[in-house]
Amino acid sequence: MYAAMVLCVDDNVGRLQACLDELGISDNTLVVFLSDNGGPIANGSWNGQLRGNKGSLWEGGIRVPFALKWPGVIPAKKMNHTFVSSVDLLPTFAAVSGADQFGPVASDGMDLMPLLQGEPGEYRDRAFFWRRGDMKNVAVRYRNYKYIMNRRTNEEYLFDLHKDISERDNMA
């Protein structure tokens, strides 16, 4: 079933691209593709070397694919390993469209366009936070370090994700 879902997404992304081409707007359209979470265990999903799954605070639950395409604006076939978040989408879309970003409302997100175009930025110097809906588990990532606390058991975990992407060597 999972393979069929992936094939369906692939087919429909192709249909979307064909439609943009047919309308003559593919060169003036920012296409964004990302997932909301890692794969669930219930259907046999495998997150490779990443520990955890959908709904967990391990990398297998929160690290997702994120791809963008905008011919002539974002260089093609480039991989960027800077850690970003979906909260960066609103400020990015506002900047791209020229819209007044939020009025009186602030955002934790950052405009990704300078990063996507290869300009230096301060993207590495911010912390990212996650929690489970029940607040029993919380996590924070700063640069290459990630801390997780299970508030039910008071277990703490600290990982250097550059050296241990599988989150096996607890340094806490």
Predicted feature descriptions by range:
Residues F66-L68:
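Short glycine- and hydrophobic/aromatic-rich loop-to-beta-strand nucleating segment
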Residues M1-Y2, P75:
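Glycine- and acidic
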Residues G39-S45, Q49-E59, I74-K78, T82-L161, ...:
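C-terminal cap/loop subdomain of S1 sulfatases and analogous C-terminal strand-loop tails that border
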Residues A3-D10, F83-V84, A106:
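Soluble non-cytosolic domains of exported or imported proteins
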Residues A3, D10-V13, Q17, D21, ...:
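Non-transmembrane alpha-helical segments in soluble domains
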Residues L7-S45:
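Metal-dependent active-site segment of extracytoplasmic phospho-/sulfohydrolases and closely related
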